[in-house]
Design a protein with these regions (language model features):
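Ligand-binding clefts/hinges and TM-proximal coupling segments of bilobed small-molecule sensing domains
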Residues: 34-39, 167-185, 248-309
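Periplasmic-binding protein-like
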Residues: 63, 133-141, 206-248, 266-286
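Flexible hinge/capping segments at coil-to-helix
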Residues: 130, 140-157
Length: 309
């Protein structure tokens, strides 16, 4: 589906189960303390002929791309899942999730979904919405007022053999890189003051830090942003209109931000971050940046650590 999320597909979902269980346990327990409330069901804005199943929005997600979507105890959970649920509710429809992997074209032709979440590419074969999320490899620091390093002695932690580590080596040099087995270790070292920064995908990094209760803030971009959109068949004009209108309502009403904050904590918009442009080790082959597994930072080793705890 996209470079970063393809890397996520190589990550063991076992590593994320502990994080998902903890997050959802808090949500469930919080709900138990409040009075039950059932909102009035909205009228469907799409006719039966516009959908594969009358009254149901079939949504394709990549269930190997945590924290956007991942299997946990038999359910698919994540940011894209929550946004899809909000979209379905706004359209007056029930939600049905389908794990379609990263192939958008086959999702429509073989899985019979109405929309697909988390699409980065554009194609004449399908329509895409305006972006609803964005990500990039960034530098995290313990203090939000921290600037990106320009000289002197500093250390940046990044997951071993990841695109984040490659970016650190490219922009600052190998002497400033501390390779870590997983992002959990990297953020714990940041919290302990053993490193000055952590380099990681903005979404994955924020998710791990937030789940661990560690204060870490993105302070600089190490690459251009990637935007994530919703796709549907190019011939499905009614669905396109419904997605456009519903997504706009959710964005203007702050619902997307609430969902992001639930999973990631409050974050500085990437558009507000400065871009590091210095390069000390220009790459010989740009394609190397797209072929590294593990660039999104959560590994099976990290999951084993969580299980032991």
């Amino acid at each position: 589906m996209n470079t970063c999320r393809k890397a996520c597909s190589n990550v063991s979902i076992k590593a994320l189960v502990a994080f998902f269980v903890a997050v959802f346990a808090v949500v469930v327990l919080s709900g138990c303390a409040s009075q039950s409330y059932t909102p009035e069901k909205k009228q469907s804005i799409l006719s039966a002929s516009a959908l594969h199943t009358d009254g149901v929005l079939r949504v394709g997600v990549d269930a190997s791309s945590a924290p956007y979507a991942a299997q946990s105890q038999g359910d698919i959970m994540g940011i894209d899942v929550d946004i899809a649920a909000a979209l379905a509710d706004e359209m007056g429809l029930k939600l049905e999730l389908v794990d379609v992997g990263s192939n958008v074209d086959s999702a429509f032709s073989q899985e019979n979904v109405d929309i697909v979440m988390g699409v980065e590419t554009t194609s004449t074969a399908f329509w895409t919405s305006e972006p609803y999320m964005e990500s990039a490899i960034v530098l995290f620091a313990s203090d939000p007022s921290t600037s990106a390093p320009t000289s002197g002695s500093f250390t940046i932690a990044a997951q071993l053999s990841s695109m984040s580590a490659w970016q650190v080596n490219d922009h600052f040099g190998e002497e400033h890189l501390m390779s870590e087995a997983d992002l959990k270790s990297a953020f714990e070292d940041l919290q302990a003051g053993k490193v000055n920064y952590v380099a990681a995908d903005s979404t994955i990094g924020a998710y791990v830090a937030h789940s661990l209760g560690i204060e870490a803030y993105p302070v600089a971009l190490l690459q251009d942003k990637t935007e994530y959109r919703i796709a549907c068949p190019s011939t499905a004009s009614a669905v396109q209109t419904a997605v456009t209108n519903s997504l706009t309502t959710l964005q203007r009403g702050g619902i997307i931000t609430v969902i992001e904050n639930k999973w990631l904590g409050e974050m500085t918009p990437l558009s507000n971050l400065p871009r590091v442009t210095t390069t000390v080790n220009p790459p010989e082959n740009d394609s190397a940046t797209t072929n590294e597994a593990g660039s999104n930072a959560v590994t099976a080793d990290e999951g084993d650590d969580e299980d032991e705890e």
